[in-house]
Regions:
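Hydrophobic/aromatic pocket-lining and membrane-interface residues
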Residues: 67, 110, 129
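Proline-aspartate-enriched helix->loop->beta-strand connector
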Residues: 94, 98-116, 125-126
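Short Gly/Thr/Asp-enriched flexible loops that form oxyanion-binding sites at enzyme active sites
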Residues: 120-132
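Active-site-adjacent beta-strand anchor residues
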Residues: 14, 112, 119
Length: 132
């Protein structure tokens, strides 16, 4: 019989948009990493509408690279976005796709937006994360 090293507890941070994890939950996320948690980073939407200088495809690619760099900087595993900007809706297909990520990560702690927020996308992300 071989002994296995127990996997550290995991935390999954789910933001609505690229940079939401950094702006809204990075401090807590980093402290949990320092406390021994395995960190997992995800933006639900890809940031394709986040630029006035670049088209949607290029903007999404830029935002993906920025998010990957942010995740790497704090030692988090990056999980790709599931939807385009303006497509964060509380529906069964999106909840099922997010649930697959949550099941894969199996976090002890899930960080996301509050249920009452200044942006509808944030509220929908919260509902999806809680459902998942």
């Amino acid at each position: 019989m071989t002994e296995t090293t127990p996997r550290p507890p995991r935390v999954l941070a789910i933001g609505a948009h690229p940079d939401d994890v950094e702006f809204h939950m990075a401090g807590t996320f980093i402290l949990l990493g320092r406390a021994g948690y395995e960190l997992h980073y995800m933006s639900l939407a890809n940031g394709c509408c986040g630029s006035t200088e670049h088209g949607p495809g290029e903007a999404a690619e830029i935002r993906r690279h920025e998010a990957m760099a942010a995740a790497a900087m704090i030692g988090a595993k990056f999980h790709p976005s599931l939807v385009n900007d303006m497509e964060i809706v509380y529906d069964v297909p999106t909840a099922a796709r997010l649930a697959a990520v949550v099941r894969q990560v199996a976090p002890r702690i899930l960080l996301t937006h509050p249920p009452n927020d200044y942006m509808e996308d944030h509220e929908a992300t919260c509902r999806l994360a809680v459902t998942a």
